[in-house]
């Protein structure tokens, strides 16, 4: 089997998705040993510089084994949208293919996968002044109150969002205040991810057969992050002076909980932080799995299998062979 020129073969995009802590990085590195791939990160947290521990960012040694793209793009004070991701990912994928290699999209930000597969509606750009005003309102009124306001002007979107989903409530109200139109009016009405495979694309999904295994792994990984210095990392971010708890970067799982723990006292209550961080990560994993179940064309590998990475490699070889034979 050879995929040295994937643009001429039947498969031009390979995706590796799964919930947080499912072993995507290890599987991607295993794939890089046998296929001519370059990794395109599909992770909304990895775009931020200076956020390494809490994002489980691939190490310098791991990134030296295979080229990685869309990591460390912006400062954590900046915003990064799904539309920006699509533009950056498409550019990176075209460059990878031009080098005769295969783009390997790896991550768990399912909204980014949806935007790339299904396209993204032409939403108005972010308005920093409006966002700042909404942040200020949230600090005095609380996000549930703003969610209630959203329900009066855009009940369709509000019904999809939790009252404390600050980032999405903020964006929906920002669109309403900027345009006078509800966010839901910009969408085609279909919020699920692609139910049919995009052309020349294959998706391997790492999913647990035992949810308890994933929960245990999440707890162990968050404990390891604390041991590795997550609290110190958040202290450094707080000391910059240009960040606050309502920024998208600081709402990332782990960072949000560590920031709140430091607000409550320094040194923080590490036992409570461990419990809250692991719980938030479990909720994230649940949402990711819900998205993945809406993609019936995916091919699954049990992430709790001892040889999960080897199974991913074998399946990827099979998928490439199948597409080459059909081309």
Swiss-Prot record:
Pfam families: IPPT (PF01715). Its EC number is 2.5.1.75. GO terms for biological process: tRNA modification. It catalyses: adenosine(37) in tRNA + dimethylallyl diphosphate = N(6)-dimethylallyladenosine(37) in tRNA + diphosphate. Substrate binds at residues 20-25. ATP binds at residues 18-25. Residues 43-46, 167-171, 251-256 are annotated as: Interaction with substrate tRNA. It is an enzyme of class 2 (transferase). Its cofactor is Mg(2+). The record marks 109, 131 as: Interaction with substrate tRNA. Keywords: ATP-binding, Magnesium, Nucleotide-binding, Transferase, tRNA processing. One of its GO terms (molecular function) is ATP binding. Catalyzes the transfer of a dimethylallyl group onto the adenine at position 37 in tRNAs that read codons beginning with uridine, leading to the formation of N6-(dimethylallyl)adenosine (i(6)A). Monomer. NCBIfam families: miaA. Belongs to the IPP transferase family. This is tRNA dimethylallyltransferase. The lineage of its organism: Bacteria, Pseudomonadati, Pseudomonadota, Betaproteobacteria, Burkholderiales.
